[in-house]
Amino acid sequence: MGSISSVNCDFLLVWRLFRNLMNTRLRNLTITSQAFGFAVKYPEPTTLDQIYEKGARVLKAVVFDMDETLLSINLNAFILRYFKDVSSMLTDIGRRSRGGTMARLGTILVDLNANRRSGTDNRTNLEFYQEEVERRCGICLSDPLIYEAFTYYDREVLPYKNDDVINAKAMPGAHAALQAVQNAGLRCALFTNPSFPQGAIECRMGWGGLADVPFELVTHMGNATRCKPDATYYLEQLQVMGLKPHEVLMVGNDPKRDFPSPACGIQTAYVGQGKPGRATWRGTMEDFARDFNAVIEAFYEHQVADELS
């Protein structure tokens, strides 16, 4: 049979036709062989047979994490650099002490990433961040002049901050993996943790050579109401894309953030360290690109296992 990834949209149909052809030949062989006193055992159903029989739901999209998945980066160094620069700007604008401003901003960012708000709070992460900065630091980030200052920093200053310490560059295998997904006719999106403004995320995309990748959706502070691993984050983005959880494969390196919590039906291909039990497939980004057929097969096998359990 041809490449699974190249015919993913018709995968089940192709497999059905192939199996029907082979089963017909085996039945004919069995009937003929009986005249010569020997028999051919009819094959047991394979995992892929079960996929078809169970009416498997077809994979439609692959969504990627960015940092340490598609982008090799010293993320802690980047966060520290960004945090110090933003704190310095807030200190100058608000005419407050640097230490106090850094402490307040740090608390806000911890609360944002930990999703410390009520379940009925539907503000975007950007709205939450802006309102908390105003409440705790006394600075209105939504003021046009102040907003423009931070936007300018993200787009015109931050791109030059990549140095030997941050060392951001494309992850080996990242572009080949994206090409494999595209060749398979699958939809593709960037599900990076939306704890940064759009400009800061696009900056890192530029460092990894991802700016021109035709992602259908890129998540950021302004279009998400929760951060990873909250299942709400994943489900609201899939709703925007018109997809259901069982139609999507997440690819990420973080054993906590890249697995929705609570589980919501999204499978994860894991490209980080360790061996999380929930992973559908494990390997490097280079492995993912080279063995994408195996990744797709693992997706369907996992789907069948869930159905049969």
What is the predicted role of each segment?
Residues S3-S6, S33:
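Serine residues within intrinsically disordered or low-complexity segments
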Residues R123-T124, L158-A189:
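Short, acidic loop-to-helix structural element flanking the phosphoryl-transfer center
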Residues M1-G2, L29:
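Compositionally biased, low-complexity segments
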Residues I79-L90, L105-N113, Q130, F150-K161, ...:
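Hydrophobic alpha-helical core bundles mediating ligand binding, dimerization, or RNAP-core interactions
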